[in-house]
Amino acid sequence: MKNNTKNKEKLDSQSSNLINKNIELISELFPNCITESLDGQSIDFELLKQELSKDIVDGNKERYRLEWPGKREAILSANSPTNKTLRPIRDDSVDFDTTENLYIEGDNLEVLKILQESYLSKIKLIYIDPPYNTGKDFVYKDNFNIDAEEELIDSGQKNEYNERLVSNPDTAGRYHSDWLSMMYPRLKLARNLMTDDGIIFISIDDNEIHNLRKICDEIFGTNNFIANTVRRRRLSQANLTKNISTIHEYILIYSKSSKTVLNKIKPKIDESEYKNPDNDPRGPYVTMPCTNKGGAKYTITTTSGKKIEEEWRFKIETYKKLEAENRIFFPRNGEGKPRYKIFLNEKKEKGILPNTWWDSISSNQEATTELKKLFDDKLYFDFPKPVDLIQFIVELSTNKEDIVLDFFSGSSTTAHAVMNCNSVDKGNRKFIMVQLPEKIEENLIAYKDGYKNISQISKERIRRSGRKIKNDTNAKIDYGFRVYQLDSSNMEETNLKIQDYNQSELDLLENNIKPDRTDNDLLTQLILNWGLPLSLKIESFEVEAKLVYKVANSLYACFDDDIDEKFAKTIAKEKPLRIVFKDSSFKNDNAKSNVKQLLKQLSPETEMKVI
């Protein structure tokens, strides 16, 4: 150890290793491109090429990494842009104008792409409960999946002569590949949204834990693996299997970087064990022995004058400090060996680190009962996650102002848990729920009660849980949420050549905004295009008899017609950072140019755009 210390203190006679530094820089941007080599870490150049290419890059070089048929397509899918947008649904929202919480309906792959600019490095906690790939619950089939027969050949389950190489390939091969191809791009996009000290928790079971661990190692980096916790999900075992009854599942935890520090948790304390025999003003305490075999050896004097030489837990300086602070207790009227005090109030404040065995959290059966009570004893969801599980995760990994994302939100347990946490510590955590509006089968109770898709139940769960928390605690927190739906772009597609249109169609294209789109639709797309959070406060007011929208202090927009110099002079007094008009808002190009020049003259900091 001494030699190592000397080597660290000694100045290196060589210049710094630029190759290693470059590898470190690349690992921050593309941790999945870091692999093992004979002499340490190296770059997987084929994978790096794929990250930087819009086309599929071929390569067959052997290396240590997880491969499956369709992986390159999955990487390409994560990197490819989307032409979709989000549309606000005010009537379905709660406190739309004031809330900072979001509920987004749509395919989470597209939604994650849309959120990349607005929420880049802003999400502190991600919790997801994705499909476990049991063979029954797979719903996210992306359009980049390769042909099934082609996969059998690529994966070695068939050769070019159509001969089967392993048994039962129809269920064994594509089964895992589809799941991996679904998860990979979503996790890759999710990582971009995490803060530098951000963290992700993923619920999973034995079907894919091995594969999930490998792709998370690749996407987040092996150094950012925090834990694989085991959670008891059943209170009683089911005797449905031939061998061992499974009563657990996993929660895989990764950070974005080494900056992540989890909060300590409140310890379980039996307060009856804490006493205060000497009326210490700091309150009740328990004592622990000061002796420790192999520790520092010295002599102490008890309160009765007895001298004791022992091997102690503390250095003599620490012992004297504890003694001066009246933290040493001598039993048997001062004759016994010293013990140090651990005060109840200090124990509560300090907290403890969590471990990997989570057995004190509610079971899935208890969570089902909890949700049934919320919906007047009606069963709409099978085995939702317990609120106290997600609440524990939120408490463990967030502070009061953080943003929490769940892009497989299901029944919106995460939203419920975030509101619970805020009610306890008066926090202002924000949630973003993303859920595919999966249709509900007509024979189910939920459908008969008027719920046509899962999203409708989820939103109602947030409303009901919010009302319950408010009634139970009277906490002054954000109970609202803005609803957005994934949809096609607000702009008409104009990929055809001009000769492909007739004159009447060309006249319509002068205004390329789809006729069914509202001002709120356009405003939302502008917020996203400019990389602003969807939770910003939106106000409206009139300027020269024209309606103007103001998004915080970041963006002004007016979609009325006949924008002129008079309007420009008045709006310039607001000194907007950005202002947007429709291209058709101006009578002609000269009018548009005049407004732009006038704004530049009267408000030089204003950036003007048209759509």
Residue ranges of model-derived segments:
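Class I S-adenosyl-L-methionine
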Residues: 35, 39-403, 425, 436-444, ...
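PRPP-dependent phosphoribosyltransferase catalytic core
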Residues: 420-611
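Beta-strand segments within the central parallel beta-sheet cores of soluble alpha/beta enzyme folds
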Residues: 227-230, 409, 430-433
